[in-house]
Amino acid sequence: MKKYFYFLSLLLLVVSCTSEDVTSNNKAFQALKDNVFWRAEFFQAGTETNGIFTVEGSLDYDQIRFQIPEPAEKTYVLGVDDDTKAVYKNTYKGKEAEFSTGTGKGNGEIMITEYNAIDNTISGTFKFTAVNADSDAEKQTIHFSEGVFYKIPVTPEHNFITTNN
């Protein structure tokens, strides 16, 4: 009888365990920021007035912004040119900082896994190391890994205002 009880307990334990999968959630933008979990509260995607496509996520004073030529389903390599780049900003007063990738600085990739023009959403993964714009700052690089953005709303027929990045 004990064997049956143990078997049923083990079976119940195995059946009740589930893995977390970001695709089971609605809309998400998250990553490990220097190995600490970071999840955006606000996110959006769309085309700026200069024609560049952007994906953005923000949490309080932190903002991540990706710039890609188009929302095509492919992998964009960072650190090669200024057309494709990742920017991280902290806008907290007194602790302002900006890190970015670009021609010959930083590295990483943005992989667009789905661009749904019918539902106006974009999904993908990312990882990057960005360089501080202030060469005299104590912290010179910031690292994002295991990044995912899922079903981020794409604003159709509305251009974002171009910012200086």
Please state what every model-predicted region is.
Residues K2-F7:
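Sec-dependent signal peptide recognition
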Residues L10-L11:
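Residue-level signal for mature regions of secreted extracellular proteins and peptides
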Residues V14-S16:
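C-terminal motif of bacterial Sec signal peptides marking the signal peptidase cleavage site
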Residues T18-D21:
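Bacterial signal peptide processing site
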Residues N26:
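Acidic, metal-coordinating catalytic segment for phosphate/diphosphate chemistry
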Residues F29, K33, F37-E41, A45-T121, ...:
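Surface-exposed helix/loop patches within compact recognition domains
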Residues Y115-N165:
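C-terminal or internal capping secondary-structure element at the end of a domain, subdomain, or sheet
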